[in-house]
Regions:
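Short strand-loop junctions, especially beta-strand C-caps/beta-turns
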Residues: 33-37, 131, 174
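N-terminal extension/subdomain marker
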Residues: 25-120
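Terminal, contiguous helix-loop blocks that mediate binding/assembly
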Residues: 110, 117-121, 125, 132-135, ...
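Bacterial N-terminal signal peptides
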Residues: 9-18
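Beta-hairpin (beta-strand-turn-beta-strand) motif
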Residues: 70, 129-131
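Bacterial N-terminal signal peptides that target proteins for export
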Residues: 1-7
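A structural signal for isolated positions on well-ordered beta-strands in alpha/beta enzyme cores
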Residues: 29-31, 64-66, 125-127, 167-170
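Sec-dependent signal peptide cleavage junction
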Residues: 17-25
């Protein structure tokens, strides 16, 4: 994976439906919210990442991985119906469907809030996946509902109402690293990960990312690990140690 710019900001902010897998004291929760859109329908990009996640779950212990996928006319991952939305979990190289939600909106505050309330824990890592929109700070698109986008107000509204504090909030999306976005997530996370430019279509390398999330016992170690990984990336910019009032 190549990101032209990776922006890492370490912020010193102290920061259940039926059959939901609960995190043990030894597990780190990773929540991935996928607005799959045409990235999945046209090229199966979300499915490729799901396959990376499934493969990685074979070798990685200590992670509770929960994925929401929706907003696409077609889903290419085995066992999923087109134009449906799902909660999935991955463990020991297998994918389990936790919830088939049918055709529901994905780019709305209440949809993200439902996901966070059902599966979130304090100190979890949250990754938001989809198309980024630069200065407008919107994540999209929901191709099932008129290409709706998750706007900044809806995102921060869901984060605030969830009453969760995350270890990391990251965007596997283009152009989501901005002062405006940083200011919005400061109250909710210790670490912000995004790029200010375009991503390649394959986005993040989840085999690598999940291994680092599993093996980093502190935000400082996670930052150092990710900095080392991307140090040779073209035009990398890394910011750490910024203190929030």
């Amino acid at each position: 994976m190549k990101l032209k710019r990776l922006v890492l900001l370490l912020l010193c902010v102290f920061f259940f439906s039926t059959a939901v897998p609960q995190a043990s004291a030894e597990q780190q929760t990773v929540l991935i919210y996928m607005l799959a859109c045409d990235l999945e329908t046209d090229s199966g990009a979300a499915t490729k990442d799901l396959l990376e996640i499934m493969k990685a779950s074979t070798d990685i212990n200590g992670l509770r991985i929960i994925v929401y996928i929706g907003g696409a006319e077609k889903l290419w991952f085995s066992g999923l119906e087109h134009a449906h939305c799902y909660d999935l979990t991955f463990e020991n190289g297998e994918c389990t469907i936790l919830n088939d939600l049918g055709r529901v909106p994905s780019a709305e505050q209440n949809s993200l809030l439902r996901f966070l309330n059902d599966y979130g824990t304090d100190g979890a890592d949250l990754i938001l996946w989809g198309h980024g929109s630069g200065k407008s700070c919107e994540l999209g698109y929901d191709d099932l509902f008129d290409q709706d986008t998750l706007c900044l107000t809806e995102l921060t509204g869901a984060l605030k109402k969830s009453d969760l504090h995350f270890r990391m909030i990251g965007f596997d999306a283009c152009e989501m690293a901005s002062e405006k976005m940083l200011g919005a997530v400061i109250p909710f996370a210790e670490l912000f990960v995004a790029t200010s430019e375009t991503e390649e279509i394959n986005g993040w390398n989840y085999s690598d990312i999940l291994a680092r999330l599993a093996n980093s016992t502190s935000s400082e170690k996670l930052v150092n690990s990710m900095v080392n990984e991307y140090r040779d990336t073209e035009n990398i910019q890394v910011f750490t140690g910024r203190k929030a009032a």
